Amino acid sequence: HSFSLTTFDPSGKLNQVERSSDASAKGTPVIAILRHDTILMASPQVCPSAFIEDDGTARFVRITPDIIVSHSGLSADGRVLVQIAQRVAVQHKYTFDENIQIDILLEEISLLFQEYTIKAAARPFGCTLIVAHLPSIGDHDLGVKPAIYQVDPSGA
C-alpha cells in the first residue's frame, strides 16, 4: 500500500488525505454560528511572529450576495480554492443569468477536493472551507433556510 499515494492502507485510509487534514486542523480557526436567521463567522487575525507580515489573505470572501466562504489551513490552498469558487460562481452567472445555488457550488468544490485526492502528481488541498449560505428574504418564503457547510480535504 505504500507504493502509491492514492492507494488505501489496510485500515481504509489515504495517507495523503490524513496529512492534508492535519494541515487543515493546524490552520487559523474559523468559527461559524447559526442562530435563527443569522450567521456569525469569526476568525482571529494572528501573525505568528513580529518579524512576519500578514500574508494579506482575506479570511472571509463573498462569492455571491448569499454565499460567503472562509478557509482554515494552508493559506495558499485557501486562496486558490476561493478563487476557483468565485470563478465557478461567475461562470454560472454568465451562463444562466442567475446566482449559483448553494448545492451546485458545494458539489463543484467537493468534486475538486476529491479529484485532488486521486490525481497523479498532485496532493490533496491542505485546507478546509467553511461555506455560509444566508438566503435573501424572498427565499425564506420558499423554505430555504440559512446553513453552514464544511468541505474538508477529502471532499466530504
Predicted features along the sequence, with ranges:
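Long, low-complexity N-terminal extensions
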Residues: 1-156
